[in-house]
């Protein structure tokens, strides 16, 4: 764990202690999958008597906040995250916008990545999961992405019907080295995939791995 990761974990533990001390729910910024895993290991046997849940808007969300609630506080205090729908004003003339386009538009509004969760692009529209505190600002100011004029509005979670597409792959490999596993997943030889690993394009549980021989077991 580097110094920055140590600071993040310490801050998250401070939030838990503040929740316990004040008797009021507390939520963190959005965390990467790696930061979530680091904190779970860091906080073992250190958390005060509060309930903790990781919330990202849907079951398989990658980016999540940590939401603490005092003992006895129930669902009357939902996690402080909001769901936004972004659609082109004129679908006929809209561009094929990518995840990078939507994220770039948010960055151009001065919004930190820590305030945004997953961005789900579906056809000509996208869903943005964001911190509750900035939802209104985004709806008012996100009016254009690249050359496409858009409308952004907050919607109820009941309107969110997204199920990530996953593919189960089965096979046999000689070892559980990283290059062997992704070779099986993408049906390519180890030699063709080593470049992806060395170029930091491969993650394991949210952490970038640059060693072909990394053992996944």
Model-inferred region functions:
Residues 1-185:
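Ferredoxin-like alpha/beta domains used as RNA- or RNAP-binding modules
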Residues 169-216:
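A basic, amphipathic helix-loop patch mediating RNA/tRNA/ribosome contacts
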């Amino acid at each position: 764990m580097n110094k920055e990761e140590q600071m993040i974990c310490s801050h998250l533990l401070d939030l838990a202690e503040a929740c316990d001390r004040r008797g009021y729910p507390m939520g963190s910024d959005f965390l990467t999958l790696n930061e979530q895993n680091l904190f779970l290991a860091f906080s073992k046997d250190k958390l005060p008597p509060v309930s903790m849940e990781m919330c990202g808007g849907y079951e398989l969300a990658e980016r999540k906040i940590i939401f603490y609630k005092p003992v006895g506080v129930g669902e009357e205090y939902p996690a402080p995250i909001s769901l936004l729908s972004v659609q082109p004003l004129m679908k006929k003339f809209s561009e094929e916008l990518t995840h990078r386009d939507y994220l770039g538009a948010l960055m151009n509004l001065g919004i930190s990545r820590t305030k945004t969760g997953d961005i789900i692009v579906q056809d000509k529209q996208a869903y943005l999961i964001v911190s509750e505190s900035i939802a209104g600002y985004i709806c008012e100011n996100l009016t254009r992405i690249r050359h496409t004029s858009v409308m952004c509005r907050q919607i109820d979670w009941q309107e969110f019907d997204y199920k990530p597409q996953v593919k189960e792959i089965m096979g046999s490999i000689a070892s559980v080295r990283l290059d062997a596993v992704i070779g099986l997943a993408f049906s390519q030889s180890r030699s063709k995939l080593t470049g992806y690993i060395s170029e930091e394009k491969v993650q394991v549980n949210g952490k970038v791995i640059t060693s072909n021989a990394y053992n996944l077991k």
